[in-house]
Structure formats: C-alpha cells, structure tokens
Amino acid sequence: MANFRTDSRIVMTLDANSAVMVFGAMQGGEFIVEPITLDANSHDLELCLQTMVKGFRMVRDQLDRQPAAISFAFPGPADYPNGIIYGYLLNFPSFRNGVALGPYLRKKFGIPVYINNDGDLFAYGEALGGVLPEINERLELSGSSKRYRNLLGYVFGDGFGVGMIVNGMMNRGDNSCVETCYFPHSKRPDIIIEEGVSIRAVKRVYKELSGDGRDLEPKDIFDIAEGRLEGSREAAVQAFAEMGELTGEAIIP
C-alpha cells in the first residue's frame, strides 16, 4: 500500500451529522483548507443535496488544483460500494427511500466519489495512521516481535457506530458495515441502544433525572458532574454512568 503521507493528491472530505456538515480537503494525511460548516438540512432531501454540492464547491474554490476524489463517511447500513444510501437512518430521515448519492456527486464534480460507513472509516484510519501503528512502533522499539493487525473501533456522538479491521482489511459485513446501534436498549426495550449511548441519550437521562429544563450539552453535564457548573451532580453522574453501562452491554452482549 502506498504511503498516504507522501501522496500529493488532494481529496475533498465531509464530516456529516444530522445538524451540520463540515467540509474540508486533505493532502498527505493533513487538512489543507479551513473547514467549512453548513447546516445539514437532513430533514429535506433536496436541501441536503444542495448543501453538499455547495460545500464541496466552496472547498474546491480554495484549492490550487483539481481534487482527485471525494471521500466521506455516512452513518448506517447502505450499499456503499455503489454509493447508494438507503435504510432506516435516524440521523438522515430524508434518505430512507434510497439515494444514489455517489453517482449524483460524481456527475456534479466529474471525479470519483468514495462513501463508506463512519465507524468503519474511523477504525480504518486508526489502523492505517493512528493507534495501531503507534502500538506496533512501541513494540518494535521495545524489541518485541509482536505486531497487531486487527482493530475494533467504536465512535460516539450523534449516533453510535463501530468498525472492524481484520488483518489490515476493512470488514464491511453483508450490509457494507459492521453495526451495533440497533441492538436493543436493556432498560427500555422500546428503543435501540443508540438512544442510550449517544449525545441525546446523555441529555435525555440528565433531564429526566434532574428536572432541569435547560438545553445542556454533554460537556455541560460533565462539568456539572465535576462540580464546575450549577446543576444536579447526582443526575449528571448517573447520566454518564448509564451511558457507560449500556456501552459495555453493546460491546460485550
């Protein structure tokens, strides 16, 4: 495999969730433009597609040469090899009837478009240029012959994702991703595990336990738990404790 750190090609990127889209460009493993953040408009398919085109055009206008490709992550199961997004996507409800997103962007920009699952790409990135080579380098420096080639990576945030790398290769599974977000919630069988470990889970549990009507983010709730912000410390601690408990159940069912 070529060393991506010495590769001079430019790739436009997108980090998307239900609220915002952050557009950028990478070369040699480094971002080369200031990120551009736009509202995702994930509830409206036409607006969402227009936002994607607008964001990538804004990035392209900052580059000194034509980008080689577009590459980005998307949540949930999909036909990633063909660039088709479909299925019950909690974060992007307007995509549930199926959208040929890869072919659409390829036609708009005239370059290859690579889309994959967010959890898979996180794990793949850590396997190529993150924690896995760092561990192997430490082993080499210590004189050990042991080398690791397998990695399981979990991502937390707007949702809950996982990626699996086996012998240096991404395991896409039968649905183009390895997924855990749809496991049942052990405390509330009417919802899925993602509703117990995501950003909205921490916010919901704290609000339910404390009765605090403020619109707080997990960082605020963490500060309450640490005693740095006014609020119910007991409820804040319990919100994160429940997240940790449910995460453990998802990782080791």
Feature annotation, model-predicted:
Residues T6-I10, V22-M26, E30-T37, L45, ...:
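Glycine/GP-enriched mid-protein hinge/lid loop-to-helix segment characteristic of carbohydrate kinases
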Residues V237-G244, G248:
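Amphipathic, non-transmembrane alpha-helical scaffold segments
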Residues P75-A78, G157-G159:
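Short glycine-rich anion-binding loops that position phosphate/pyrophosphate groups of nucleotides
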Residues M1-S8, L14-A16:
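N-terminal helix-turn-helix/winged-helix DNA-binding helices
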Residues I10, N17-A19, Y80-I84:
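Interdomain hinge and pocket-entrance segments immediately C-terminal to HTH DNA-binding domains
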Residues E30-Q66, G231:
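N-terminal phosphate-binding loop and adjacent alpha-helix
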Residues M52-I70, P112-V113, G211, A250-P253:
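Phosphate/pyrophosphate-binding loops at sites that engage ATP/ADP/AMP, CoA/4′-phosphopantetheine
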Residues N41-Q50, Q66-I70, G76-Y148:
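Glycine-rich phosphate-binding loop and adjoining helix at the ATP-binding site
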